[in-house]
Structures are given as structure tokens and as C-alpha cells.
Amino acid sequence: MTTTLINALRDSLASEMALRKSRLESLCVLIVGVLVSRTVNLSHLAGGFPGTAEIASNYRRLQRFFEQVRLDYTALARVIVQLTGLGQGPWLLALDRTNWKLGRRDVNILMLAVLRDGIAVPILWTAMDRAGNSTSDQRSALLSRFCAIFGAASIAGLIADREFVGTAWMTYLAKHDIPFILRIKKDFHVRLADGRHCKIGSLFQKLAKGGRRYLRDDATLGLTAKGQSPAVKLAATRLASGELLVVATNTEPRTALAHYKRRWEIETLFAAVKSRGFNLEDTHLVHPERIAKLLAVLGAITESW
């Protein structure tokens, strides 16, 4: 069965991936090995390869793949869309970050994924070389790569949590006509269309649990001492826990909250590739480029999750 899967996958990838036959076969064997064994631990994968090769030989083969092979991530993004049947969009995208520690090393991944049927499909990612939040430049570079491949018109909306705000970042999204739905903090200052200034929390302080409120008139957020956001509309709800959830958007505010609720799908993705799925933390890979290759393997098998 695994040989049949490997051959079928090789046929699918051959027209898209500019790899020598032996390296394409290594990629396919790796993808099927992860799919069958449900782990990314290289030692375990080496023991699950089809054929009669010794485990030590298979392990060296995996090491050479991660050390030597250069992958075309633009082609891979198209392959993932093709293999998962996503069509041509427009898609709801989620931007998020996941991280873990391997010894003293921090592994930190910035991920852009398409939301689909309860789980996100990873399309592009950046393996960052330091701990902590991403920068505006890193986010912009990731979105620019996506738009170069699929076009900005393929984005129905970009959803992101409170970490992913900022004057430069939101200005980039507005400048490139990317519809966004970004959760914002309640202590942000806002300037309303009538000229009033207040904090987000005080603006919606009377909102009852389960209640919703939409501000359709343009407002601006005072994100830093140096600048304000582009014009946005606001939508808010009070969660059952009593927590206030407010999103800033350049789309229709009445649909923004419904779209934002789907952000959990990228959390499901992270759970699937980490401790509740393929145990991504078990890999001993820490080099950003090698982590990126491993994520490419996981992206190719999203449909199986």
C-alpha cells in the first residue's frame, strides 16, 4: 500500500516540483512515512520506510534530505492547494504563530493558512530564528509571497489575533487592498467619526454577555505614539466568560465577528501537528530552513487529518 501511495504522490508532484528523481522520491517517501507513522520523529520514520534498507541507512537518507535539498516553496504552495482541493478562492486566511523549545533553542513558526471545514490548511510559513512575536516586516513578507502566488483577490479576509496589530502592518494591508479582521486590545485608544477619543474598553463597557455592537462609521486606532491605523470599522461582543472581544476590520463589520470565530481552525491545525497529532515538538530539527521543509511535508498531508 505504501508503495502505491508513494508512486501516486510522485506522479502528482513531478510536474510541479523541480527535483531530481531521487530527491523527489525521498520527498514522497518522507510524506508517506509521516502519514503512516503519525510522527515526525526522524528515528521513528527511518524504521517505517518500505523496502529492505537498514534503519541506519534510511535515517541518513532523511538527514541528507533536510541538509541538502532545496525546496521551491512557491511550487509547494500550489501543490498543497491542488492536493487539498481548495480551488481558486477567495479564501479566509488565518495568520498565527506557534513555538516550542528544544533544549535551550527556541523554535518559532509564523504560519499563514487557509480556513477550511474545521481545520486550517498551511500554505506558507516562516521559521523565525528567534523567540517572541513576529515583526511587521516578517508578516508583510509572508503576505507578499502569498499575493505573488495567488493574488490579493484570492483573499476573502485575513484573520489574526491581538498579537498581529500595528500601524505599519495595518497600513500595509490597507495599501494592498487585503481585507482584514484583527482582534484588538481593550486598552487601545480610538478616534471615532464624530471626533471623540476614548479607549476601546470604555466604548463597549455596557455590552452585555452575548450582546453585539457594530460601528459602521470609520474610526482610527491610536496604536503607537507615532501613528494611527488606517480607517477601520469596529465590531464587538461580550463572551460568556465576560471577556470583551473587539475586532477592527476594513470589511463589513456584521460579518467580521462570524469570520473571526473561525480563527480556532488554525489552533486545530497546530494541535494536529504538535502534541495531539504528529508530535512536531519531537523532531530534533532546529535550523529554520529544515523546520520549513518539515512543515512542507505536513502541509502536503493536511487532507488526511
Language-model-detected regions and their locations in the chain:
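Single, function-defining residue in the core of a domain
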Residues: 1-40, 51, 76-78, 87-91, ...
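Short alpha-helical "recognition helix" segments of helix-turn-helix
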Residues: 45
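Short, basic interhelical loop/turn and adjoining N-cap
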Residues: 49-61
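Active-site-proximal, Lys/Arg-enriched surface segment
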Residues: 59-119
